[in-house]
A protein has these predicted regions:
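Anion-coordinating catalytic cores for phosphoryl-, nucleotidyl-, and glycosidic chemistry
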Residues: 1-25, 33, 42-48, 90-99, ...
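Generic recognition of stable, solvent-exposed alpha-helical segments in well-folded globular domains
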Residues: 24, 28-35, 62, 102-103, ...
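A broad structural signal for short, well-ordered beta-strand segments within beta-sheet-rich domains
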Residues: 81-87, 106, 114, 148-152
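Residue-level recognition of conserved beta-strand positions in structured domain cores
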Residues: 15, 121-122, 156
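Metal-dependent nuclease catalytic regions and adjoining charged, substrate-binding loops involved
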Residues: 67, 88-90, 141-203
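Short, solvent-exposed loop/turn segments at secondary-structure junctions
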Residues: 18, 125, 161-162
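A non-catalytic, helix-rich entry segment at domain boundaries
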Residues: 16, 21-96
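Non-catalytic protein-protein interaction segments used by genome-maintenance enzymes to assemble
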Residues: 91-144
Length: 203
């Protein structure tokens, strides 16, 4: 929640998911990947080419190679072992205090034995995001399923790193609703905010 620490108002606006910024080449490639990985992971065990995954023929060879590498990274993630894809690009809303937040989750997986959930936010770039921002997703999903937050995992997955980089939200790093509400309360002076834990650094 670095953005929150710097500018509470802007952070609240970002959480409400305003209109996306103007598309750039990297952003368009990321969008293609998000669509393709949903197709690939929902068809595990099936031979699935880029065309079948919805990757447009208009992409150049370098971009197609990059998409394929990202998809292979996602498919081979140890994080996803024992999980099956449940939903992609799914929205959930949660009201915290006087603020209603809309969360769009890239992918949600269900553990095969039914014992828990895993939220994944795919990142095709390498700029790392503080993992405690996933706390809002965890609370929103847990509330929508009527399950405790302890049964919901969440992680950023950076697919551009060799083998993928996983930054998972730990139980200790999960912000509670009071902390999030305090952070979103307009007009609260910074010294009245509940202290926010620093994100845990993972290798």
């Amino acid at each position: 929640l670095d953005d929150l620490r710097a500018d509470r108002h802007q952070f609240a606006l970002d959480l409400r998911r305003p209109l996306p910024p103007e598309p750039r080449a990297a952003g368009r490639l990321g969008t293609v990947f998000h669509d393709a990985v949903a197709q690939r992971l929902s068809a595990r065990g099936t031979l699935f080419g880029l065309g079948q995954a919805g990757v447009p023929d208009s992409l150049g060879p370098q971009d197609r190679d990059r998409i394929e590498r990202w998809l292979e990274t996602a498919e081979n993630l140890p994080l996803l072992e024992d999980y099956v894809l449940a939903e992609t690009e799914t929205d959930r809303e949660i009201t915290i205090g006087a603020t209603t937040l809309r969360c769009r989750m890239d992918a949600v997986f269900h553990r095969l034995d039914g014992s828990g959930w895993l939220i994944v936010d795919w990142k095709t770039g390498r700029r790392q995001v503080p993992v405690d921002q996933l706390s809002v997703y965890v609370h929103a999903w847990a509330a929508s399923q009527g399950v405790p937050t302890g049964s919901v995992r969440a992680a950023y997955v950076y697919v551009d790193y060799p083998g993928g980089r996983v930054d998972e939200l730990t139980a200790a790093g999960l912000l509670d609703l009071d902390q999030i509400e305090s952070a979103l309360t307009p007009g609260s002076p910074p010294d009245e905010m509940t202290p926010l834990p620093a994100p845990e650094q993972q290798g």
